[in-house]
């Protein structure tokens, strides 16, 4: 509404959806419309997973699933929308963009960026070559709600687990 020019952007979890769509070239009104259109698909609960959960609890007394939703709906939505803007890989995005996630096994922050990043002091891992759908799926993989996202040999979860607001990373773009 105020026509503020945005030079770079970052987002974690659902913020990664907004940041990615904006960086790919969608206007705020378009992003609002996309959320309204696809919200139910994103929130979809896989009833097979609920059955597995109940079956596992009854037979073993243990939780045998890693999420109520696989996260594939986010992956497909982001790929669909970004592919319409000729964005397939995070490196295809021209606007500086940072999307954090967390390695579930090591606890390391994995930051996906659209451009090379300057030196950084902590153990954050920077990746600027990844499928755009995987990037956002990983950042949105909130434990127990969404299954962890497989990326290379790692399992990634919601960036908010360690890096809720990626201001430091954006600062280094």
Which stretches of residues belong to each language-model region?
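Patatin-like phospholipase
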Residues: 1-12, 20-173
């Amino acid at each position: 509404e105020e026509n503020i020019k945005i030079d770079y952007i970052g987002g974690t979890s659902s913020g990664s959806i907004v940041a990615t769509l904006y960086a790919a070239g969608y206007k705020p009104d378009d992003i609002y419309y996309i959320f309204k259109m696809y919200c139910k698909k994103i929130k979809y609960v896989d009833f097979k997973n609920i059955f597995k959960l109940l079956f596992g609890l009854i037979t073993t007394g243990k939780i045998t699933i890693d999420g109520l939703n696989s996260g594939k709906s986010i992956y497909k939505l982001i790929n669909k929308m970004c592919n319409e803007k000729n964005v397939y890989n995070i490196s295809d995005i021209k606007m500086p963009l940072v999307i954090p996630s967390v390695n579930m096994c090591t606890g390391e922050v994995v930051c996906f960026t659209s451009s090379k990043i300057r030196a950084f002091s902590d153990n954050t891992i920077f990746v600027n070559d990844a499928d755009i759908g995987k990037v956002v799926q990983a950042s949105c993989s909130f434990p127990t709600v969404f299954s962890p996202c497989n990326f290379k040999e790692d399992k990634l979860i919601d960036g908010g687990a360690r890096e809720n607001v990626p201001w430091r990373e954006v600062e280094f773009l």
